[in-house]
Protein backbone atom coordinates (compact mmCIF):
# COMPACT_ATOMS: atom_id res chain seq x y z
CA UNK A 1 0.00 0.00 0.00
CA UNK A 2 2.80 2.36 0.93
CA UNK A 3 4.57 1.83 -2.40
CA UNK A 4 1.36 2.28 -4.38
CA UNK A 5 0.76 5.60 -2.64
CA UNK A 6 4.12 6.86 -3.90
CA UNK A 7 2.97 6.94 -7.53
CA UNK A 8 0.23 9.59 -7.14
CA UNK A 9 2.54 11.45 -4.75
CA UNK A 10 5.27 11.47 -7.41
CA UNK A 11 2.87 12.63 -10.12
CA UNK A 12 1.51 15.36 -7.87
CA UNK A 13 5.03 16.60 -7.15
CA UNK A 14 5.93 16.66 -10.85
CA UNK A 15 2.80 18.69 -11.66
CA UNK A 16 3.65 21.08 -8.81
CA UNK A 17 7.23 21.45 -10.05
CA UNK A 18 6.09 22.13 -13.60
CA UNK A 19 3.48 24.68 -12.54
CA UNK A 20 5.23 26.86 -9.94
CA UNK A 21 7.02 29.95 -11.20
CA UNK A 22 9.43 32.23 -9.32
CA UNK A 23 10.86 33.85 -12.44
CA UNK A 24 8.99 37.10 -11.75
CA UNK A 25 10.31 39.15 -8.79
CA UNK A 26 6.82 39.89 -7.43
CA UNK A 27 6.24 36.15 -6.91
CA UNK A 28 9.40 35.65 -4.85
CA UNK A 29 7.81 35.62 -1.43
CA UNK A 30 6.06 33.31 0.98
CA UNK A 31 7.18 30.63 3.42
CA UNK A 32 8.48 28.12 0.86
CA UNK A 33 10.47 30.67 -1.11
CA UNK A 34 12.00 32.32 1.96
CA UNK A 35 12.78 29.02 3.71
CA UNK A 36 14.03 26.81 0.88
CA UNK A 37 14.44 28.64 -2.44
CA UNK A 38 16.20 31.85 -1.38
CA UNK A 39 18.82 30.08 0.82
CA UNK A 40 19.64 27.72 -2.07
CA UNK A 41 20.01 30.70 -4.39
CA UNK A 42 22.42 32.40 -2.00
CA UNK A 43 24.52 29.25 -1.48
CA UNK A 44 24.76 28.55 -5.22
CA UNK A 45 25.68 32.17 -5.94
CA UNK A 46 28.37 32.10 -3.24
CA UNK A 47 29.84 28.83 -4.53
CA UNK A 48 29.93 29.94 -8.16
CA UNK A 49 31.01 33.54 -7.61
CA UNK A 50 33.42 33.35 -4.68
CA UNK A 51 34.71 29.79 -4.42
CA UNK A 52 34.80 28.38 -7.96
CA UNK A 53 35.80 31.38 -10.06
CA UNK A 54 32.40 31.75 -11.76
CA UNK A 55 32.13 28.05 -12.69
CA UNK A 56 28.42 27.61 -12.03
CA UNK A 57 28.23 24.15 -13.59
CA UNK A 58 30.72 22.86 -11.04
CA UNK A 59 28.87 24.79 -8.33
CA UNK A 60 25.64 22.94 -9.20
CA UNK A 61 27.42 19.58 -9.05
CA UNK A 62 29.03 20.32 -5.68
CA UNK A 63 25.79 21.66 -4.18
CA UNK A 64 23.78 18.61 -5.32
CA UNK A 65 26.40 16.24 -3.90
CA UNK A 66 26.57 18.11 -0.58
CA UNK A 67 22.77 17.99 -0.23
CA UNK A 68 22.69 14.27 -1.07
CA UNK A 69 25.45 13.52 1.45
CA UNK A 70 23.59 15.47 4.17
CA UNK A 71 20.44 13.47 3.42
CA UNK A 72 22.33 10.17 3.22
CA UNK A 73 21.68 9.06 6.85
CA UNK A 74 17.91 9.35 6.31
CA UNK A 75 18.11 7.30 3.12
CA UNK A 76 20.34 4.62 4.66
CA UNK A 77 17.89 4.23 7.53
CA UNK A 78 15.13 3.74 4.98
CA UNK A 79 17.13 1.11 3.07
CA UNK A 80 17.89 -0.79 6.28
CA UNK A 81 14.28 -0.79 7.49
CA UNK A 82 13.04 -1.89 4.07
CA UNK A 83 15.44 -4.84 3.85
CA UNK A 84 14.80 -5.91 7.46
CA UNK A 85 11.04 -5.87 6.92
CA UNK A 86 11.34 -7.78 3.64
CA UNK A 87 13.56 -10.53 5.07
CA UNK A 88 11.41 -10.95 8.19
CA UNK A 89 8.26 -11.10 6.10
CA UNK A 90 9.74 -14.00 4.12
CA UNK A 91 9.94 -15.99 7.36
CA UNK A 92 6.62 -14.82 8.77
CA UNK A 93 4.66 -15.07 5.50
CA UNK A 94 3.19 -18.59 6.04
CA UNK A 95 1.83 -17.61 9.47
CA UNK A 96 0.64 -14.20 8.26
CA UNK A 97 -1.22 -15.73 5.30
CA UNK A 98 -3.02 -18.22 7.58
CA UNK A 99 -4.19 -15.42 9.86
CA UNK A 100 -5.24 -13.28 6.90
CA UNK A 101 -7.43 -16.18 5.76
CA UNK A 102 -8.99 -16.21 9.23
CA UNK A 103 -9.75 -12.49 8.89
CA UNK A 104 -11.44 -13.10 5.51
CA UNK A 105 -13.54 -15.95 6.91
CA UNK A 106 -14.48 -14.09 10.08
CA UNK A 107 -18.22 -13.42 10.31
CA UNK A 108 -18.32 -11.34 13.46
CA UNK A 109 -16.39 -8.32 14.65
CA UNK A 110 -15.10 -10.36 17.60
CA UNK A 111 -13.61 -12.97 15.27
CA UNK A 112 -11.91 -10.27 13.21
CA UNK A 113 -10.51 -8.61 16.33
CA UNK A 114 -9.21 -11.95 17.60
CA UNK A 115 -7.52 -12.67 14.26
CA UNK A 116 -5.98 -9.19 14.19
CA UNK A 117 -4.67 -9.71 17.72
CA UNK A 118 -3.14 -12.97 16.56
CA UNK A 119 -1.54 -11.14 13.64
CA UNK A 120 -0.04 -8.56 16.00
CA UNK A 121 1.44 -11.41 18.05
CA UNK A 122 3.13 -12.75 14.91
CA UNK A 123 4.56 -9.29 14.19
CA UNK A 124 5.81 -9.11 17.77
CA UNK A 125 7.28 -12.61 17.52
CA UNK A 126 9.40 -11.63 14.52
CA UNK A 127 10.12 -8.11 15.82
CA UNK A 128 8.22 -6.49 12.96
CA UNK A 129 6.81 -3.00 13.33
CA UNK A 130 4.14 -2.17 10.69
CA UNK A 131 4.05 1.47 11.81
CA UNK A 132 7.79 1.78 11.26
CA UNK A 133 7.31 0.33 7.80
CA UNK A 134 4.56 2.84 7.02
CA UNK A 135 6.97 5.65 7.93
CA UNK A 136 9.45 4.38 5.33
CA UNK A 137 8.65 7.25 2.96
CA UNK A 138 9.40 9.84 5.68
CA UNK A 139 13.03 10.34 4.54
CA UNK A 140 11.77 11.16 1.06
CA UNK A 141 9.28 13.68 2.45
CA UNK A 142 12.01 15.30 4.56
CA UNK A 143 14.33 15.80 1.59
CA UNK A 144 11.69 17.04 -0.86
CA UNK A 145 11.54 20.71 0.24
CA UNK A 146 15.35 20.96 0.14
CA UNK A 147 15.65 19.36 -3.30
CA UNK A 148 12.70 21.38 -4.61
CA UNK A 149 14.29 24.59 -3.36
CA UNK A 150 17.34 23.98 -5.55
CA UNK A 151 15.07 22.88 -8.40
CA UNK A 152 13.28 26.25 -8.50
CA UNK A 153 16.58 28.15 -8.32
CA UNK A 154 17.72 26.41 -11.50
CA UNK A 155 14.37 26.21 -13.31
CA UNK A 156 13.67 29.92 -12.92
CA UNK A 157 17.36 30.93 -13.22
CA UNK A 158 17.35 32.99 -10.04
CA UNK A 159 21.17 33.23 -9.91
CA UNK A 160 22.55 36.01 -12.10
CA UNK A 161 25.80 34.11 -12.65
CA UNK A 162 23.95 31.55 -14.76
CA UNK A 163 23.35 34.34 -17.29
CA UNK A 164 26.81 35.93 -17.05
CA UNK A 165 28.87 32.71 -17.04
CA UNK A 166 26.63 30.07 -18.64
CA UNK A 167 29.22 27.87 -20.38
CA UNK A 168 29.95 24.45 -18.88
CA UNK A 169 31.35 21.44 -20.74
CA UNK A 170 29.60 21.45 -24.15
CA UNK A 171 26.37 23.26 -23.20
CA UNK A 172 24.96 26.60 -22.11
CA UNK A 173 23.54 26.40 -18.58
CA UNK A 174 20.90 29.00 -19.41
CA UNK A 175 19.42 27.19 -22.42
CA UNK A 176 17.86 23.76 -23.06
CA UNK A 177 20.26 21.06 -24.25
CA UNK A 178 19.01 17.82 -25.77
CA UNK A 179 22.00 15.71 -24.73
CA UNK A 180 22.00 16.59 -21.04
CA UNK A 181 18.22 16.07 -21.14
CA UNK A 182 18.68 12.56 -22.56
CA UNK A 183 21.39 11.79 -20.00
CA UNK A 184 19.06 12.86 -17.17
CA UNK A 185 16.22 10.71 -18.53
CA UNK A 186 18.44 7.63 -18.95
CA UNK A 187 19.91 8.00 -15.46
CA UNK A 188 16.46 8.27 -13.88
CA UNK A 189 15.40 5.15 -15.79
CA UNK A 190 18.42 3.31 -14.35
CA UNK A 191 17.70 4.66 -10.88
CA UNK A 192 14.11 3.42 -10.99
CA UNK A 193 15.30 0.03 -12.29
CA UNK A 194 17.86 -0.37 -9.49
CA UNK A 195 15.22 0.54 -6.90
CA UNK A 196 12.66 -1.90 -8.35
CA UNK A 197 15.04 -4.88 -8.11
CA UNK A 198 14.52 -5.16 -4.34
CA UNK A 199 10.75 -4.68 -4.41
CA UNK A 200 8.49 -7.64 -3.57
CA UNK A 201 6.80 -9.24 -6.58
CA UNK A 202 3.42 -7.69 -5.76
CA UNK A 203 4.96 -4.18 -5.77
CA UNK A 204 7.25 -4.61 -8.76
CA UNK A 205 4.61 -3.50 -11.26
CA UNK A 206 4.58 -0.08 -9.63
CA UNK A 207 8.38 -0.02 -9.92
CA UNK A 208 8.13 -0.73 -13.64
CA UNK A 209 5.63 2.10 -14.02
CA UNK A 210 8.07 4.47 -12.31
CA UNK A 211 10.78 3.32 -14.75
CA UNK A 212 8.63 4.68 -17.58
CA UNK A 213 6.93 7.68 -15.97
CA UNK A 214 9.86 9.34 -14.19
CA UNK A 215 12.18 9.60 -17.25
CA UNK A 216 9.31 10.88 -19.41
CA UNK A 217 8.46 13.60 -16.87
CA UNK A 218 12.13 14.53 -16.42
CA UNK A 219 12.65 14.82 -20.19
CA UNK A 220 9.39 16.71 -20.69
CA UNK A 221 10.31 19.39 -18.12
CA UNK A 222 13.99 19.57 -19.14
CA UNK A 223 13.22 20.14 -22.83
CA UNK A 224 11.68 23.52 -22.02
CA UNK A 225 14.03 24.48 -19.16
CA UNK A 226 17.60 25.68 -18.77
CA UNK A 227 20.15 22.88 -19.08
CA UNK A 228 21.28 23.73 -15.53
CA UNK A 229 18.17 21.81 -14.48
CA UNK A 230 19.18 18.80 -16.60
CA UNK A 231 22.65 18.90 -15.02
CA UNK A 232 21.09 18.97 -11.55
CA UNK A 233 18.88 15.97 -12.36
CA UNK A 234 21.76 14.04 -13.96
CA UNK A 235 24.07 14.45 -10.96
CA UNK A 236 21.28 13.67 -8.50
CA UNK A 237 20.21 10.53 -10.39
CA UNK A 238 23.81 9.30 -10.77
CA UNK A 239 24.35 9.67 -7.02
CA UNK A 240 21.10 7.83 -6.28
CA UNK A 241 22.02 4.95 -8.61
CA UNK A 242 25.34 4.40 -6.81
CA UNK A 243 23.77 4.94 -3.38
CA UNK A 244 20.89 2.54 -4.00
CA UNK A 245 23.06 -0.17 -5.57
CA UNK A 246 25.63 -0.38 -2.77
CA UNK A 247 23.10 0.21 0.02
CA UNK A 248 20.98 -2.68 -1.26
CA UNK A 249 24.00 -5.00 -1.41
CA UNK A 250 25.12 -4.10 2.12
CA UNK A 251 21.76 -4.02 3.89
CA UNK A 252 20.57 -7.23 2.24
CA UNK A 253 23.53 -9.01 3.87
CA UNK A 254 22.88 -7.28 7.20
CA UNK A 255 19.18 -8.15 7.11
CA UNK A 256 19.82 -11.82 6.26
CA UNK A 257 22.30 -12.10 9.13
CA UNK A 258 19.92 -10.50 11.65
CA UNK A 259 16.97 -12.59 10.47
CA UNK A 260 18.90 -15.88 10.70
CA UNK A 261 17.87 -16.50 14.38
CA UNK A 262 14.21 -16.16 13.37
CA UNK A 263 14.73 -18.68 10.55
CA UNK A 264 16.37 -21.14 12.93
CA UNK A 265 13.56 -20.69 15.46
CA UNK A 266 10.99 -21.24 12.69
CA UNK A 267 12.72 -24.45 11.62
CA UNK A 268 12.89 -25.77 15.20
CA UNK A 269 9.21 -24.96 15.74
CA UNK A 270 8.04 -26.69 12.57
CA UNK A 271 10.45 -29.66 12.67
CA UNK A 272 10.35 -30.46 16.37
CA UNK A 273 14.13 -29.99 16.68
CA UNK A 274 14.84 -32.89 14.28
CA UNK A 275 16.99 -32.82 11.20
CA UNK A 276 14.08 -33.80 8.98
CA UNK A 277 13.17 -31.01 6.63
CA UNK A 278 9.47 -30.44 6.23
CA UNK A 279 7.62 -28.57 3.58
CA UNK A 280 7.53 -25.30 5.50
CA UNK A 281 11.28 -25.45 6.16
CA UNK A 282 11.97 -25.96 2.49
CA UNK A 283 9.93 -22.87 1.67
CA UNK A 284 11.91 -20.76 4.12
CA UNK A 285 15.23 -22.19 2.90
CA UNK A 286 14.37 -21.42 -0.72
CA UNK A 287 13.42 -17.88 0.18
CA UNK A 288 16.63 -17.50 2.13
CA UNK A 289 18.69 -18.33 -0.96
CA UNK A 290 17.01 -15.66 -3.06
From Swiss-Prot:
It is found in: Cell membrane. Coiled coil: none annotated. Residues 1-19 form the signal peptide. Pfam families: 60KD_IMP. Disulfide bonds: none annotated. GO terms for biological process: protein insertion into membrane; protein transport. It comes from the Bacteria. The chain crosses the membrane at residues 56-76, 134-154, 176-196, 207-224, 229-251. Keywords: Cell membrane, Chaperone, Lipoprotein, Membrane, Palmitate, Protein transport, Signal, Transmembrane, Transmembrane helix, Transport. It is a multi-pass membrane protein. GO terms for molecular function: membrane insertase activity. GO terms for cellular component: plasma membrane. Residues 270-290 are annotated as: Disordered. A lipid is attached at residue 20 (S-diacylglycerol cysteine). A lipid is attached at residue 20 (N-palmitoyl cysteine). Required for the insertion and/or proper folding and/or complex formation of integral membrane proteins into the membrane. Involved in integration of membrane proteins that insert both dependently and independently of the Sec translocase complex, as well as at least some lipoproteins. PANTHER family: CYTOCHROME C OXIDASE ASSEMBLY PROTEIN COX18, MITOCHONDRIAL, OXA1. Belongs to the OXA1/ALB3/YidC family. Type 2 subfamily. This is Membrane protein insertase YidC. It comes from Staphylococcus aureus (strain NCTC 8325 / PS 47). The lineage of its organism: Bacteria, Bacillati, Bacillota, Bacilli, Bacillales.
Amino acid sequence: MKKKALLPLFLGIMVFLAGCDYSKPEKRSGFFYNTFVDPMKNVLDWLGNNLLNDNYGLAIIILVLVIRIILLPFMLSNYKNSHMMRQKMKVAKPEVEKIQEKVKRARTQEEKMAANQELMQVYKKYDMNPIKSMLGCLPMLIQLPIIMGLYFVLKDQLVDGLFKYPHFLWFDLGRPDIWITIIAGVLYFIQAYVSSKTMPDEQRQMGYMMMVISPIMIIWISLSSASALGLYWSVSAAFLVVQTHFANIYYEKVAKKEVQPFIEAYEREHNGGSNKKGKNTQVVSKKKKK
